[in-house]
Regions:
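Intrinsically disordered, low-complexity sequence elements enriched in Ser/Thr/Gly/Pro
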Residues: 20, 48, 111-115
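Canonical BTB/POZ domain core
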Residues: 2-12, 17, 23-99, 103-105
């Protein structure tokens, strides 16, 4: 199988469908996705030839946005930190794991500051 960086790949992540370039998925070569889409890990496809990933489908959009932009981009009021953290661990994306930890720590500090201010 020829692997090209500009290949557009179709994904089935927990029943949610995504399209992206191979280069996006291999941006972090030591990650699970990097290994999977560089041919180092076996992969399965569904009946529509979409790569099957047994992850949280809705949360994968945040992982994919990180892979595309190298930034943690989340909607205002985002509350699903535990799920996102679990998914980042599952995909073994160390930079994303660190950004999530940093963001969660900032939220904790902000909440503590608000509690202190309220007294």
């Amino acid at each position: 199988m020829d692997l090209h960086e500009d290949d557009v790949l179709e994904l089935n992540v927990g029943g949610c469908f995504y399209s992206t370039n191979r280069s996006t998925l291999t941006r972090y070569p030591d990650s699970m996705l990097g290994a999977m889409f560089s041919g180092r890990l076996p992969s399965k496809v569904d009946q529509c030839n979409r790569y099957i990933i047994d992850g949280d489908g809705p949360t994968f959009r945040h992982v994919l946005n990180f892979l595309r932009r190298s930034k943690l981009i989340l909607p205002d009021g985002f509350k699903e930190w535990d799920i996102l953290s679990i998914e980042a661990d599952f995909y073994q994306i160390e930079d994303l794991i660190r950004l999530i930890e940093k963001a969660r720590e900032q939220i904790r500090r902000d909440e503590e500051r608000e509690r202190t201010r309220a007294y």
